[in-house]
């Protein structure tokens, strides 16, 4: 009997309940709320669900995830050593059609203009007392690109990774709610009614050459983002070449789904109570909203300028698609345009700045790394 009591006491002392804190309880509640939003409300379920579950796992005491060899340490290593974000970019590249951007190259400027939100949030973060590396990692939320946000945070501010990732993916899911009021604020109804000419046909040769030339140029300009841009364009080359269908299919489906699970779960595993339950987390979430609004406004305002310069041939609404939430931001441009004129079709025109935003966010991240440096 004594031996049983000793064994039972040992089990209790070694259990997670003994080390369980109110912070762990709060974070588990946060995980459950995120699961509710993902599953019931449909907020980025493929991403927020594993992030939320990883958050719950991270706040179980005495698991040894960070110290004991195993699958969880492997997943955390995939984030720490920047393995997963480039692989996600390969899948994104395989699913992306750069045709609208090639057909109308000036929309690249709209993708660049939308990155103003990144730098607005960066300045805001510095004013709130974040150091320049932390501010850079927070600012990239404005690019509406989850993998790039995680990539930059892991290099510049690993302790803020969880908050930055949750803010980025949460606001990406809220693009249809955040963008329309900003778009309508900065445009008149007449501007929203502008119909754009049909895009020219892009040749197969152009689609094959584009990822090769883009990779070489951007990688030479900003070597720090070569892995992101290189994988993005390699995935695109798989699709556009016409002779690598199996690789394209794998990148779009099996690889993309597998890496998404690991990246999102690993992000959740970084959301420990001691690092997440701080005033900084609230500030990051607020700055993320400022970044999204700033990016949308920057794209629309540059679209207005472009419309003035080309005699009203460009609908300013497509500028809001310069954030890299593909294809959600382009769809929002289409919806807002059709609210002004049901016969207005802007989707393909908006896809130009939308895919340019993917490149633009990576370039913005590379610029920050070049200017500030990683960890």
Swiss-Prot record:
GO cellular component terms, A-Z: plasma membrane
InterPro entries to which the protein is assigned, alphabetical: OadB_MmdB
Reactions the enzyme catalyzes: (2E)-glutaconyl-CoA + Na(+)(in) + H(+) = (2E)-butenoyl-CoA + Na(+)(out) + CO2
A Pfam family hit: OAD_beta
Gene Ontology biological process: glutamate catabolic process via 2-hydroxyglutarate; sodium ion transport
GO MF annotation, one: glutaconyl-CoA decarboxylase activity
EC numbers: 7.2.4.5
Post-translational modifications: The N-terminus is blocked.
Record keyword Cell division present: no
Record-annotated membrane-spanning stretches: 16-39, 46-65, 74-96, 107-130, 137-153, 160-178, 208-232, 254-271, 284-302, 316-332, 345-369
Keywords: Cell membrane, Decarboxylase, Ion transport, Lyase, Membrane, Sodium, Sodium transport, Translocase, Transmembrane, Transmembrane helix, Transport
Membrane topology label: Multi-pass membrane protein
Places the protein is found: Cell membrane
Keyword Glycosyltransferase: no
Pathway info: Amino-acid degradation; L-glutamate degradation via hydroxyglutarate pathway; crotonoyl-CoA from L-glutamate: step 5/5
Subunit structure: Heterooctamer consisting of two alpha, two beta, two gamma and two delta subunits.
Similarity field: Belongs to the GcdB/MmdB/OadB family.
Its biological purpose: Tunnel subunit of the primary sodium pump glutaconyl-CoA decarboxylase (GCD).
Name of the protein this chain belongs to: Glutaconyl-CoA decarboxylase subunit beta
Protein's organism: Acidaminococcus fermentans (strain ATCC 25085 / DSM 20731 / CCUG 9996 / CIP 106432 / VR4)
């Amino acid at each position: 009997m004594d031996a049983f009591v000793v064994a039972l006491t040992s089990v209790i002392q070694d259990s997670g309940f003994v080390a369980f804190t109110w912070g762990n309880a709060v974070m588990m509640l946060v995980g459950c709320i995120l699961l509710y939003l993902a599953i019931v409300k449909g907020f980025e379920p493929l991403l927020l669900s594993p992030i939320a579950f990883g958050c719950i796992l991270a706040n179980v005491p005495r698991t040894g995830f960070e110290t004991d060899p195993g699958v969880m340490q492997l997943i955390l290593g995939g984030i720490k050593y920047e393995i997963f974000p480039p692989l996600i970019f390969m899948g994104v590249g395989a699913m992306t059609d750069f045709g609208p951007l090639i057909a109308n190259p000036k929309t690249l400027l709209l993708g660049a203009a939308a990155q103003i939100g990144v730098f607005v949030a960066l300045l805001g973060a510095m004013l709130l007392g974040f150091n320049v590396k932390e501010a850079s990692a927070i600012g990239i939320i404005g690019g509406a690109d989850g993998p790039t946000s995680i990539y930059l945070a892991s290099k510049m501010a690993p302790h803020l990774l969880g908050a930055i990732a949750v803010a980025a993916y949460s606001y990406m899911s809220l693009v249809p709610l955040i963008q329309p009021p900003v778009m309508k604020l900065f445009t008149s109804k007449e501007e929203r009614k502008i119909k754009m000419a049909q895009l020219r046909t892009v040749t197969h040769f152009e689609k094959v050459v584009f990822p090769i030339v883009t990779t070489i140029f951007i990688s030479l300009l900003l070597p720090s983002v070569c892995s992101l841009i290189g994988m993005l364009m390699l995935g695109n080359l798989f699709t556009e070449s016409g002779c690598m269908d199996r690789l394209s299919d794998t990148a779009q489906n099996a690889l993309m789904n597998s890496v998404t699970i690991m990246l999102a779960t690993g992000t959740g595993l970084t959301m420990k109570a001691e690092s997440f339950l701080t005033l900084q987390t609230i500030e990051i979430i607020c700055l993320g909203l400022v970044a999204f609004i700033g990016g949308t406004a920057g794209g629309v305002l540059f679209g207005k300028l472009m419309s003035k310069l080309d005699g009203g041939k460009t609908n300013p609404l497509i500028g809001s698609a310069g954030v890299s939430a593909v294809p959600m931001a382009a769809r929002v441009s289409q919806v807002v345009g059709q609210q002004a004129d049901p016969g207005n079709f802007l989707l393909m025109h908006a896809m130009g700045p939308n895919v340019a935003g993917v490149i633009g966010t990576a370039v913005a991240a590379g610029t920050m790394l070049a200017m500030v440096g990683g960890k």
